[in-house]
Amino acid sequence: MSVRITEVEAYLGPHDSPHPDPGSHTFRGATARNAPMFGPAGHLYVYFTYGLHHCANIVCGPAGVASAVLLRAGEIVAGEELALSRRPASKSPKDLASGPARLATSLGITTADSGRDALEAPFGLELPAMQAVDVSAGPRVGVSGAGGTHDYPWRFWLSGDPTVSRYKAAKVRTP
């Protein structure tokens, strides 16, 4: 299976780091769950959310420094049949990997893959030769508090791509 990533979100470190990120799972420090996000680069950080979905991140910083990009959306370019078998409720090919949980499900990524090297089998990352495309930036999807504001325009997507997920602001929580 091959996927062209069309949307990501960046997440950085704990409150006491040089780059504190209130929207990050690492903001309150290292835990057993978020340990893979502290490196090394090129490894997966996978978490289970809402008791339903897996979401996959690729760690970006050196060992000991929390940073990762959440893989938010992609286009299945090879292996559509396998993706459909994993996501039979998909309404169209562009829907197969539009959103972080759909993308992880299409790829068959689970928390069992957290900490694995994304550059080694069965995974693989490559930067194919292609023309430059327009990239848009804005606030992250569904992140509450300061980390979900325009002060953190760390969501990046290929402008106009039909597989990019819809923007949804976080719901305001009342105490």
Residue ranges: model-predicted function:
Residues M1-P175:
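Conserved, well-structured core segments that form or line functional sites
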